[in-house]
């Protein structure tokens, strides 16, 4: 292990917050088109389905890049890597703000994909290096809380800016946020040297880790099922639930608040009953994406299903990462990079599949198919015996 448990003088929690702010910023950038899809489509004359590539493209490149980061970085200080990726994040959002065509916006989003893969591949494994062992669970919730916090403040703020000043200003605002995050990171994050480089053998050694492989499968199903529907949440709320455009921002804010609550609730629950926590998350997601298009034909019911959706999805990232840490305690960066790769591949596949379904069959059919994917994840969790997981963990992972 490349441990660096900071003492009190190293400001471990401020450093952890800086890493969490980095994840918040990159997730805000990644999810921004979700709240801006309608004005982007209008400005650049594209179909909703094609514009969905603004979500799937960066996710696809993040999936490809995440494992390559930990392989290629070798012994490079992780602090230096984070600084470099934040600089790239600033450039990607400036390019997006200046884009005059969908093709140029796609290029900016591909550049963002490299930032996502790089930042998450590193950030996911930093909790145990920045804080004492007893505080790792809380540090994970802070770092992965950036996902839910981006839904609360990032995406709704993007919607407000997009409505008031145009969607380009939303991307410009994220570039400014990335610059401020970079300054904080330079001030509070300690050097994070690596004494043992990760090799290709480190990855191939995990082929026999059944618990890790199951976690990766669950990651793909839960995230793909979510993003099949969530990529089109704005048109879903407006056309199915009959919610006016001016209320979409506040509703997404409420969705994000529910997500933050779900993140910390799931973080605590997963520490005690991980499998059961993930099963409840899968059930909540399935109910939300199935029932919103089928029964959410009024603003009140549509909003209620959206809040359920937020609570359930808020617990996804922290619970799945907890699964990875338990599955491969002696290969944290390997497990983290594989997790991020599958997570973003699932975003790409889910949003791409959702775009195809929406363009050909409509929003309701897309919601039903999304729910079926999530129910498959639930079925796998129900059929997987806890005893089998415990046995697999002992057999596949060396003692931590």
Question: Where would I find each of the regions flagged by the language model?
Answer:
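Primarily marks hydrophobic transmembrane alpha-helices of the MFS/SLC 12-helix fold
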Residues: 79-82, 105, 278-279
